[in-house]
Amino acid sequence: MRVVIQRVSHASVTIEGVCKSAIKEGFMILVGIEEADTQEDADWLCKKIIGLRVFDDENGVMNKSILEVGGNILVISQFTLHASTKKGNRPSYIRAAKHDVAIPLYNYFCQELSIGLGKEVGTGEFGADMKVELLNNGPVTICMDTKNKE
């Protein structure tokens, strides 16, 4: 699993002209799922995301987690995170999981984030054409990949 985490002042996702989810301060997370990804990968990411200390403390130092600031999370499925650009100019998405693998794992990931956060996370709609708006705060953008746990 691969995620791009952006610290935001606010974010929203619109599908067919209707706002599906909107959040205030927190994380907007793009998540890409591969065929070989598992619930253990999702669990590892959730633990890291919930504990990630990238919000300012009273001294302006990034030292607080999303739990400590009462932040929110918006999760957007993003198969293009697994694009391969080695050959030619048209990306290949062969590494991205098919719907029958990706949807249950995406739902599990969102559910586990909700449990860790103690409140519902906002989501997009898997496979939909979405319009995502966000105000990146910092900017702070962090990438994580369960195949490269650094």
UniProtKB/Swiss-Prot annotation:
GO terms assigned for molecular function: D-tyrosyl-tRNA(Tyr) deacylase activity; Gly-tRNA(Ala) deacylase activity; Ser(Gly)-tRNA(Ala) hydrolase activity; tRNA binding
Catalytic activity: glycyl-tRNA(Ala) + H2O = tRNA(Ala) + glycine + H(+); a D-aminoacyl-tRNA + H2O = a tRNA + a D-alpha-amino acid + H(+)
SUPFAM superfamilies, sorted: DTD-like
Keyword RNA-binding: yes
Cell location: Cytoplasm
Motif Gly-cisPro motif, important for rejection of L-amino acids in this chain: 138-139
Superkingdom of the source species: Bacteria
Keyword terms, alphabetized: Cytoplasm, Hydrolase, RNA-binding, tRNA-binding
Enzyme Commission number, as recorded: 3.1.1.96
GO cellular component, one term: cytoplasm
The keyword Cytoplasm is assigned to this record: yes
Pfam family, one: Tyr_Deacylase
Primary location: cytoplasm
GO annotation terms (biological process): D-amino acid catabolic process
InterPro entries, alphabetized: Daa-tRNA_deacyls_DTD, DTD-like_sf
Domain remark text: A Gly-cisPro motif from one monomer fits into the active site of the other monomer to allow specific chiral rejection of L-amino acids.
Family: Belongs to the DTD family.
NCBIfam families per record: D-aminoacyl-tRNA deacylase
Subunit (UniProt): Homodimer.
Functional note: An aminoacyl-tRNA editing enzyme that deacylates mischarged D-aminoacyl-tRNAs. Also deacylates mischarged glycyl-tRNA(Ala), protecting cells against glycine mischarging by AlaRS. Acts via tRNA-based rather than protein-based catalysis; rejects L-amino acids rather than detecting D-amino acids in the active site. By recycling D-aminoacyl-tRNA to D-amino acids and free tRNA molecules, this enzyme counteracts the toxicity associated with the formation of D-aminoacyl-tRNA entities in vivo and helps enforce protein L-homochirality.
Name of the protein in its database record: D-aminoacyl-tRNA deacylase
Organism for this UniProt entry: Phocaeicola vulgatus (strain ATCC 8482 / DSM 1447 / JCM 5826 / CCUG 4940 / NBRC 14291 / NCTC 11154)
Gene: dtd
